[in-house]
Amino acid sequence: LLDVAQISEIVAVVDGNTFVRPMYAGNAMATVRSSDPIKVITVRTTSFGAAPTSSESASIESVNVPADPGISHVIGQESSKSDRPELTAARVVISGGRGLGSAENYRKLLEPLATAFNAALGASRAAVDAGYVPNDYQVGQTGKIVAPDLYIAIGISGAIQHLAGMKESKVIVAINKDPEAPIFQVADYG
């Protein structure tokens, strides 16, 4: 429809045509230039601070919206309900991995901890694939990107895809019986 390239997950704006975005699971940064007249971008969560507040109100611009061309249709809506904070917006995230051994251990160990911290629950892909938790708990390159104030990883070895989804957390605490686990390379405490 717009006939322009989309630039995803930007973490910095160099100028009106140049943006920085992660690549290779967040292990390198690419500087991308777009000469398209319209820019379509997505922003990586927590990459930018809050805009300064002002006493001035923003201008309101009226636009004419064309009629729906009928190209796509909503076939349903479903809201998930939880007493816990939403994973991508939580200040504290507690994630479990395959090292927990079972879905029962995940629930028994992590749920009381998450309640005490008012934290969201997350998981590694291995824990999701093992059936410990549903797919919407997954943190990582193929899951959700999080950057909380505190990220606690329990029983997570730290595959590069998982690290790409949580390494921007302010403080990372890792608990793993393998002292050589990659999670310790990004952990502040372990």
Model-assigned labels for residue ranges:
Residues 1-190:
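N-terminal glycine-rich FAD/FM-binding segment characteristic of electron-transfer flavoproteins
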